[in-house]
Structure formats: structure tokens, C-alpha cells
Amino acid sequence: MPQQRKGGRRRRKVDLIAANHIDYVDYKDVDLLKHFISERGKILPRRVTGTSAKNQRKVANAIKRARIMGLLPFVAED
């Protein structure tokens, strides 16, 4: 007899960018960008954050710009 998995379907995560009707992800909006980076400073993948592919590209570019401008760290401080 095959094993049955516990639990049901997981609820789909809401795209934070689309839900708030944000057209342009500003690299200066550090509070918004912190939702999309880990505690180690890495960009979180789509499956974790729930963003669409288009918005994930916007977020990734904004995070990279903010890192270059010195607004976000490249690596986390231990």
C-alpha cells in the first residue's frame, strides 16, 4: 500500500509587487527590497517570494542597483 502524504495543497503566495500596484521597483526603496533578500543578503527565488517572473526581474535589478549604490549589502554582517 503506498504512503499517503500529509497535508493538502499549499496556498499560492501573493505577488507583493502586483498586489500593491507598483509599476516601477525603485532601488532607493530599501524597505520594499528587504522583503526579497535573505538574512545573508542573497536574492530570494520566485518560489519563496511568490513574485511573477516579470516582477522578479525588476526586483533583482533594483537590488543589484541598490548594492552598487551602497544602500544594500552584498553580504550580511555576522
From Swiss-Prot:
Top-rank lineage group of the source organism: Bacteria
Matching InterPro entries: Ribosomal_bS18, Ribosomal_bS18_CS, Ribosomal_bS18_sf
A GO MF term: structural constituent of ribosome
Cellular component terms per the entry's GO annotation: cytosolic small ribosomal subunit
Keyword Heme (UniProt): no
Subunit structure: Part of the 30S ribosomal subunit. Forms a tight heterodimer with protein bS6.
Stated family: Belongs to the bacterial ribosomal protein bS18 family.
NCBIfam families per record: S18
Task performed by this protein: Binds as a heterodimer with protein bS6 to the central domain of the 16S rRNA, where it helps stabilize the platform of the 30S subunit.
Protein name: Small ribosomal subunit protein bS18
Gene source species: Lactobacillus delbrueckii subsp. bulgaricus (strain ATCC BAA-365 / Lb-18)
Encoding gene, per UniProt annotation: rpsR
